[in-house]
């Protein structure tokens, strides 16, 4: 959980959590964590091209308030947010697109009393921590 810094200011009073999970088994662990929260959870997700995007995201269907897709900054091996959106369009999510990490966090900070969970790639989490 990020409790201070630039990104926490953007998140406002909402909790901001990062998790480097990027495979199917980690998605089950994250989904279980989400089930145990007493607040709505908004996901911010970016992944590498070689991952099982649909299976990873399927774990969160029916559990999250929304999913915001972004590109992994400074990483050529990531799937584009638009291609990612196409790959998971058959899943039941309220999908959003953002051009940046801080933009995605800001977009989700408008939902009161929620948790913003950034996940899907260790590269993404590294960029999040660098921003903060």
Language-model features, listed with the residues they occupy:
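C-terminal helical cap/extension that packs against the catalytic core
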Residues: 15-16, 57-115
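Nucleotide phosphate-binding/pyrophosphate-handling subdomain across enzymes
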Residues: 1-66
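Short, active-site-adjacent cap segments at secondary-structure transitions
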Residues: 124-126
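Active-site-proximal loop/hinge segments that shape catalytic or ion-binding/gating pockets
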Residues: 121
């Amino acid at each position: 959980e990020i409790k201070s810094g630039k990104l926490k200011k953007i998140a406002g009073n909402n909790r901001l959590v990062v998790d480097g999970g990027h495979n199917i088994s980690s998605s089950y662990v994250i989904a279980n964590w989400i089930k145990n929260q007493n607040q709505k959870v908004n996901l911010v997700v970016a992944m590498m091209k070689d991952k099982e995007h649909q299976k990873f995201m399927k774990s969160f269907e029916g559990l999250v308030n929304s999913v915001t897709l972004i590109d992994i900054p400074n990483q050529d091996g990531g799937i584009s947010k638009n291609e990612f959106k196409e790959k998971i369009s058959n899943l039941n999510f309220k999908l959003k697109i953002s051009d940046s990490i801080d933009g995605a966090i800001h977009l989700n900070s408008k939902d009161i009393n929620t948790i913003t969970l950034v996940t899907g790639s260790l590269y993404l989490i590294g960029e999040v921590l660098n921003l903060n």
